[in-house]
């Protein structure tokens, strides 16, 4: 991981967490100061907990933030059940995940939809965490780089910078399966992503953080975080427990 790019460990709680889980978040906050020289920390709880988590953060200066897992592209309107980026930021989010593979698969989100959501996050003043990644079938067909390149081109709006954008590479076949690609495979894809970002966005693209996601856990975090062009992790299930989440952050160089 280049020393110039500070690591980000982002936790995606997905559809998990009730008020009782505030204790886990408080434990994360308690352990965060010891990791201040390692990484920035971000937790994206379900929207029902976003405000409560934000209140726990308070106004103190620390490298810890809360974010959201998705947003609607519009500011407001007749979109029953949806939440705009502005609403999420108002509730305390400073970053919003867009284009997660589960949204792409379960809700049919296309690259153009993801792009609009990324623009919405920027509009509201939030960082867009744009997810890309191939399925098992695409991997087996040798299409990984083609798929990732196409998703990057279609999902990232013009104007991406290191301040408003994070890219997360999540091979779909590795999410929640316990399977992880080899370090060499991760390096190949992350270097490809970096090349795409630099060619399109120049110096800003060279500084955008690229996270790895897909069965990241304490036992493999150190190896993954040592891979060139891996600037942190997007963590799923392991982010639900403070001990695991903090241990993953401790694996950053």
UniProtKB/Swiss-Prot annotation:
Substrate binds at residues 12-14, 176, 215, 236-237. This is Triosephosphate isomerase. Involved in the gluconeogenesis. Catalyzes stereospecifically the conversion of dihydroxyacetone phosphate (DHAP) to D-glyceraldehyde-3-phosphate (G3P). Belongs to the triosephosphate isomerase family. CDD domains: TIM. It comes from the Bacteria. NCBIfam families: tim. Transmembrane segments: none annotated. Pathway: Carbohydrate biosynthesis; gluconeogenesis; Carbohydrate degradation; glycolysis; D-glyceraldehyde 3-phosphate from glycerone phosphate: step 1/1. GO terms for molecular function: triose-phosphate isomerase activity. Pfam families: TIM. GO terms for cellular component: cytosol. Keywords: Cytoplasm, Gluconeogenesis, Glycolysis, Isomerase. It catalyses: D-glyceraldehyde 3-phosphate = dihydroxyacetone phosphate. It is found in: Cytoplasm. HAMAP family: TIM_B. It comes from Rhodopseudomonas palustris (strain BisA53). GO terms for biological process: gluconeogenesis; glyceraldehyde-3-phosphate biosynthetic process; glycerol catabolic process; glycolytic process. Homodimer. Its EC number is 5.3.1.1. The gene is tpiA. The keyword RNA-binding does not apply. The active site is at 100 (electrophile), 170 (proton acceptor).
């Amino acid at each position: 991981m280049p020393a110039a790019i500070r690591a980000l460990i982002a936790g995606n709680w997905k559809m998990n967490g009730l008020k009782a889980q505030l204790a886990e978040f408080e434990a994360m906050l308690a352990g965060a100061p010891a990791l201040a020289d390692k990484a920035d920390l971000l937790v994206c709880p379900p929207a029902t907990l976003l405000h409560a988590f934000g209140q726990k953060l308070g106004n103190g200066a620390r490298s810890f933030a809360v974010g959201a897992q998705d947003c609607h592209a519009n500011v407001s309107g007749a979109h029953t059940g949806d939440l705009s980026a502005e609403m999420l930021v108002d509730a305390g989010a400073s970053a919003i995940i867009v284009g997660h593979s589960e949204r792409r698969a379960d809700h049919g989100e296309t690259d153009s939809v993801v792009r609009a959501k990324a623009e919405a996050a920027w509009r509201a003043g939030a960082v867009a965490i744009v997810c890309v990644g191939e399925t098992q079938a695409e991997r087996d067909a040798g299409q990984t780089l083609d798929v990732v390149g196409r998703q990057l081109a279609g999902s990232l709006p013009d104007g991406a910078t290191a301040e408003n954008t994070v890219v997360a590479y999540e091979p779909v076949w590795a999410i929640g399966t316990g399977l992880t690609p080899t370090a060499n495979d991760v390096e190949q894809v992350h270097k490809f992503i970096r090349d795409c970002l630099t060619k399109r966005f120049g110096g800003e693209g060279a500084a955008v953080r690229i996270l790895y996601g897909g069965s990241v856990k304490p036992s493999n975090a150190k190896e993954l975080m040592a891979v060139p062009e891996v600037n942190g992790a997007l963590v799923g299930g392991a982010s639900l427990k403070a001990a695991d989440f903090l241990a993953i952050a401790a694996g950053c160089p």
